[in-house]
């Protein structure tokens, strides 16, 4: 019998850095600005992306320096109790909740672009924060809800 994939065999805290990084599907949703409803605590996604996000590629243009350049960029390895703000489709959130990766995830599909082909990335909807005046005008209902 073949060995189970690492994400089945290990807890998130046990993953190597390479394994951790490979869990990212490249959707770009974590790089979108989010707002929190003060009354309900609901996380509202916007289509406004961090200035470092290459929207077409859904990749950070300064990944190694992102925490220095964007002080509120979160190191997910350091805040596992904060996964609730990640989209429901995020591998880190799914695995922390004991749920499987979706069929379109690159580790499951074997294709790096499967997240884009499945329409799960922000490459066709995001706009850079550098061209937006009012983030509140760009809230997108339900963006973080669907797997």
Swiss-Prot record:
InterPro entries: Puta_zinc/iron-chelating_dom, UCP006173
Domain of life: Bacteria
Coiled-coil zones: none
Family per similarity comment: Belongs to the UPF0260 family.
NCBIfam families per UniProt: PRK05170.1-5, PRK05170.2-5
Protein name, as recorded: UPF0260 protein MCA0521
